[in-house]
Curated annotation (Swiss-Prot):
The gene is pckG. This is Phosphoenolpyruvate carboxykinase [GTP]. Belongs to the phosphoenolpyruvate carboxykinase [GTP] family. One of its GO terms (molecular function) is GTP binding. It comes from Corynebacterium jeikeium (strain K411). The active site is at 271. It is an enzyme of class 4 (lyase). It is found in: Cytoplasm. GTP binds at residues 270-275, 386, 417, 512-515. Its cofactor is Mn(2+).
Length: 606
């Protein structure tokens, strides 16, 4: 079958795919069409083209081999939650946490925007696999895009190209993604270095397993394998198929006895998730490796335990705040190069810099392309600037990240950024209690999403608020159901808070690599080696059971970090009740029972 604009024959005989591509060509009207094969030649060709075009700046080959800096349009710098839609067949299925529009109405509206939106541009057909390509029943996808920057990002973030296309084969299932930056070119019209459109839509059709995105070239809005597929669409698939798609890191912790434990952790953005994923333990004999830094797909193994797979192939991390002290392994991952940077600053010797990175440059070109000095009064890198780098370059990448069976999960952590109330570490009483803890997880507002007031407390159930692809009440029910199915083989669940402050406003706990002391306590609990204090919020660690050798912090500070004040929790009760009511009538009775249990314990502790 010939496709208009494609040179030669299509490299697939999958009729459903070919028909879909033909419809897309008809709709978008691109100048040419190309199937991406994921090869190095293709990467080099795209990079060369984008450097020539001014979209990418090639970095110093010695310092940053095969690496590039992109500067986006200043209006296109983060996920736009207000323009993100879950277009399930009924509004009830989208629930109160998602924007909803009738799917037929949305398709009609988007077709108008898509119509001719690739004029003067090349259409790229990007086949990709979520998780290891060796998986006997892999989750596959195809993104159709007009952004070569997206193609390069997808090559890092997924197993992309010919192998994935071959996996789909003649009749394999795949998630369909359509993406256009929404900037058609008339003959002779000069192109922008970062084409995008003021009108933006990131829409999901969960029942049809489709994603349509328009107007943005940035990160999670455009790299559809990331949050769109790996969380929003996958969470709907997981509910239907009996697994879980979660916004969690996957960490491998190795004890002095050489026993490996796998820990998943869900933190809202800017709460130290990537730092924990690549933690370097400070306590003797303990080691850690990373399986994933952002997303975990959890399923039951043959032995009835919960196993985690990282569906991604790269890290897409926030650059500012990353340095050799806070996250040495992320920095070392970038040392071999092959990295795509977005909206960081450029040094005079063609290298990259961002706030809190080592060195004090006296002159830079900032993320907007302007001259910058320390007196400029603005940040040189955008607060949500990014590095995109292959996982395999991380010196502590666990080999299991390529194992389609996944890794057995010993513990799940929830954590937010709370200055008060929440102790350093507490164990949930059981799975239903854990679901309640996750459902009411809250954090101080950060600037990693494009909207919302910084500093306010934001509820973020399981750190999934922007990513649940269906009704949040049904999502909590799915957690309860998975717990019922897994029984006593479910992982233990813990609530952590690295960010507790004293009355004078200083952090009580040092965080970063020292968090390994908390991880050790968690393992000690799993192995039955330590007791805990039963508090209103769960089983809280006792000071004497935390390994404190070599810690600079005082005993007084650590005791305060571990403390549980029922009066603080009483203050949280009204907030939690309001939140659960907002989530609507589908919130499981088990979660309300846990809320009542907390209320009763707080009352009894007065």
């Amino acid at each position: 079958m010939t496709i208009r604009g494609l040179v030669g024959e299509a490299p697939t005989k999958n009729q459903e795919m070919l028909n879909w591509i033909e419809e897309a060509v008809e709709l978008f009207q691109p100048e040419s069409v190309v199937f991406c094969d994921g090869s190095e030649e293709e990467w080099n060709e795209l990079a060369e083209q984008l450097v020539e075009h001014g979209t990418l700046i090639k970095l110093d080959e010695e310092a940053q081999p095969n690496s590039f800096l992109a500067r986006s349009n200043p209006s296109d710098v983060a996920r736009v939650e207000s323009r993100t839609f879950i277009c399930s067949k009924t509004e009830e299925d989208a629930g109160p946490t998602n924007n909803w529009m009738d799917p037929e109405q949305m398709r009609a509206e988007m077709r108008e925007h898509f119509s001719g939106s690739m004029k003067g541009r090349r259409m790229y057909i990007v086949p990709f696999c979520m998780g290891p390509i060796t998986d006997p029943s892999p989750k596959l996808g195809i993104e159709i895009t007009d952004s070569p920057y997206v193609v390069m990002s997808m090559r890092i973030m997924t197993r992309m190209g010919k192998e994935a296309l071959d996996k789909i084969g003649e009749n394999g299932e795949f998630v369909k993604g359509l993406h256009s930056v929404g900037a058609p070119l008339e003959p002779g019209q000069e192109d922008s270095t970062w084409p995008c459109n003021d009108t933006k839509y990131i829409t999901h059709f969960p029942e049809d397993r489709e994603i349509w995105s328009y107007g943005s070239g940035y990160g999670g809005n455009a790299i559809l394998a990331k949050k769109c597929y790996a969380l929003r669409i996958a969470s709907a698939m997981a509910r239907d198929e009996g697994w879980m798609a979660e916004h969690m890191l996957i960490l491998k912790l190795i004890s002095p006895e050489d026993k490996a434990y796998y820990i998943c952790a869900a933190f809202p953005s800017a709460c130290g998730k990537t730092n924990l994923a690549m933690i370097q333990p400070t306590i003797p004999g303990w080691r850690a490796e990373v399986v994933g830094d952002d997303i975990a797909w959890l399923h039951f193994g043959e032995d009835g335990r919960l196993y985690a797979v990282n569906p991604e192939n790269g890290f897409f991390g926030v650059a500012p705040g990353t340095n050799y002290a806070s996250n040495p392994m992320a920095m070392k991952s970038m040392e071999p190069g092959n990295t795509l940077y977005t909206n960081v600053a450029l040094t005079d010797d063609n290298n990259v810099w961002w706030e809190s990175k080592e060195g004090e440059p006296q002159h830079l070109i900032d993320w907007l392309g302007n001259e910058w000095t320390p007196d400029s009064g603005n940040k040189a890198a955008h607060p949500n600037s990014r590095y995109c780098v292959p996982i395999e370059q991380c010196p502590v990448a666990a080999p299991e990240f390529n194992d389609p069976k996944g890794v057995p999960v010993s513990a799940i952590l929830f954590g937010g950024r709370r200055a008060d109330t929440v102790p350093l570490v507490t164990q949930a009483r059981d799975w239903n209690h854990a679901t309640f803890i996750g459902a009411t997880l809250a954090s101080g507002q950060t600037a990693a999403a494009a909207e919302a007031a910084v500093g306010s407390l934001r509820h973020d159930p399981m750190a999934m608020l922007p990513f649940i692809g269906y009704n949040a009440g049904d999502y909590l029910q799915h957690w309860i159901d998975m717990g019922n199915k897994g029984g006593d083989k479910m992982p233990e669940v813990f609530l952590v808070n690295w960010f507790r402050r004293g009355e004078d406003g200083r952090f009580l706990w040092p965080g970063f690599g020292e968090n390994s002391r908390v991880l050790k306590w968690i393992i000690d609990r799993i192995e039955g080696r330590v007791e805990a204090d039963e508090t209103v919020v769960g089983y809280t660690a006792r000071y004497e059971d935390i390994y404190t050798d070599g810690l600079k912090e005082t005993e007084e500070d650590i005791r305060e970090a571990l403390s549980v004040n029922p009066a603080d929790w009483e203050r949280d009760l009204a907030d939690n009740e309001e939140w659960l009511k907002f989530l609507g009538p589908k919130v499981p009775s088990e979660v309300w029972d846990e809320f009542q249990g907390l209320k009763d314990r707080v009352e009894a502790a007065k």
